[in-house]
Amino acid sequence: MAKKSVIARNEKRKRLVEQYAAKREELLKAGDYEALRKLPRDSSATRVRNRCVLTGRGRGVYEKFGLCRHMFRKLALEGKIPGVKKASW
């Protein structure tokens, strides 16, 4: 499980991206890079990390499900993810 502070930091970044999205778009279209540079760094979408919603793990996350590979496998084998079953051919 990831540290709670790391998860909280990522959530803060998500909020900032949402808050400044319109302003960033407007400044990019205008080409005003000086004003864009003065915005908070964490308001850039590239600083947000996809994390597992259950464990907070930052690597091996399936974006479609929002789960890391470990939790995805565990829940899929338990039959808790609808429409997902183990491959067999």
From Swiss-Prot:
Name of a matching Pfam family: Ribosomal_S14
GO CC term, one of those recorded: small ribosomal subunit
Name of the molecule in the record: Small ribosomal subunit protein uS14
Coiled-coil boundaries: none
Family annotation (PROSITE patterns): RIBOSOMAL_S14
Alphabetized HAMAP family for the sequence: Ribosomal_uS14_1
NCBIfam families in the cross-refs: PRK08881.1
Any one Gene Ontology BP term: translation
Oligomer status and interactors: Part of the 30S ribosomal subunit. Contacts proteins S3 and S10.
Similarity comment: Belongs to the universal ribosomal protein uS14 family.
InterPro entries with a match to the protein in the record: Ribosomal_uS14, Ribosomal_uS14_bac/plastid, Ribosomal_uS14_CS, Ribosomal_uS14_sf
Function recorded in the entry: Binds 16S rRNA, required for the assembly of 30S particles and may also be responsible for determining the conformation of the 16S rRNA at the A site.
UniProt keyword list: Ribonucleoprotein, Ribosomal protein, RNA-binding, rRNA-binding
Nucleus among keywords: no
Upper taxonomic lineage: Bacteria, Pseudomonadati, Chlorobiota, Chlorobiia, Chlorobiales
GO molecular function: rRNA binding; structural constituent of ribosome
